[in-house]
Amino acid sequence: MEQSTPSQSPPVSRRTVLKLGLVGLIGVAAGAGSTAVIAGLGRKARPKYRFFTDAEGALLIEICEQIIPHDDVPGATETGAIHYIDRQLCGVFARHQQTYRRGLESFRQTCLEIYKMPFEELSGSRKFEALRAIELGSAPKALWSNPPPQVFFNLVLAHTMQGFYGSPRHGGNRDYASYRMLGLDYPPVTGRNHRREA
C-alpha cells in the first residue's frame, strides 16, 4: 500500500529561491582536473568517488538535483556539487562521513518502504514528497535513529549550496555557473593587490 506525505508545489521555483540571498556561500576544497586514459598501461580505472560508493553517489546525485535542478542554467549535477561533497568528506567534512553513509541508507530504505521502489526511479512529484518527508521529520521513525532525518536533509542542503556557490577550485560550481546565473563578476584571488597605480 502506497503511503505519501502531503504534497504541495512550492510557491516559487527552486531556481528563484537560489537567487535570493545565497550569494555568500563558500566551499572549501580544491577541484580536480580531468584524468587522461592511456591505452596499454594496464592501469586500473580511477574510482568515480573518493568516499561514496557508486550506489551512494547515484542516490546523492538525484537528491542534489532536486535541490538545485537543471533548467535554463546548469543544476547540481553539471556544476559538480556531489564532487565537492565527496572531496570534503575526505577532508574538512570527515566528521560527517557516518551521517552521510547512514543517512543515505535510511533514505533508501524510506523510499522502498513508502513507494516500493528506489528514489532514483520515482517521478518528480514523488521525489519532492520523499525529500519533503525527511525535511519535516515525518519519515518513518523506525528507519531513522542516527542521524535524524532533518539533520541529514539540512546537511545535504547546506553542502549542495556550498558546492553550487563556492569557488570552482573547491570542486563544485563548474565553469562559474552560479556566478554567471547571478550576473556576478568572478571573485578576486585572495591576497592579490588590486590597488590601481597612481
Residue ranges of each PLM-predicted region?
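N-terminal secretory signal peptides and thylakoid transit peptides that target proteins
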Residues: 5-25
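C-terminal segment of N-terminal export signals and the immediately downstream linker at the start
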Residues: 10-16, 29-67
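Short low-complexity stretches enriched in small and charged residues
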Residues: 17-21, 43, 85-88, 176
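Short alpha-helical scaffold segments that flank and stabilize functional sites
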Residues: 20, 24-27, 67, 106
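Short, polar/charged, Gly/Pro-enriched helix-capping and turn/loop motifs at alpha-helix termini
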Residues: 24, 31-32, 141, 170
